Amino acid sequence: GGLPGVQTRGTLLYTYGVREGRITQEQMCKFLSENPAKLYGVYPQKGVIAPGSDADIVLIDPKKESTISAATHAYNTDNNPFEGFELKCGIAKVFLRGNLAVDDGKLVQEKLGKYIFRGKKQI
């Protein structure tokens, strides 16, 4: 169930939120990391850059431009509700627990996932 979208939510939020002055970069970080981590009971292991936290970091390239297309996304579907949307940024690097996982849109390390036990939600 659901719609494809998690792959592009950060770049959409940056393009149509931050770049258009609707939200700040700090708000974007809260929307995409801190608030979900608190909601799912994994904060402060996730959702913050601090000593003892996991160091999950996404670096955005604000100069990269692209167009969302079902032909190029990583979902196992043939459609995308954001088909044709223009993005004014791209994902440069993704670090999971401090390990480089994605570099310029390419997966460089597989199977970095780790089960995380949930606590009480904090939101």
Model-predicted segments: where are they?
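His/Asp/Glu-enriched, well-ordered alpha-helical/loop segment
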Residues: 1-63
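Residue-level signal for well-ordered alpha-helical segments
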Residues: 5, 26-29, 36, 68-73, ...
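Short C-terminal domain-edge/linker segments immediately following a structured domain
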Residues: 7-15, 87-94, 123
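Generic alpha-helical secondary structure signal
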Residues: 18-20, 44, 79, 86, ...
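C-terminal cap of metal-dependent C-N hydrolases
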Residues: 51-116
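Short, solvent-exposed cationic patches
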Residues: 116-123
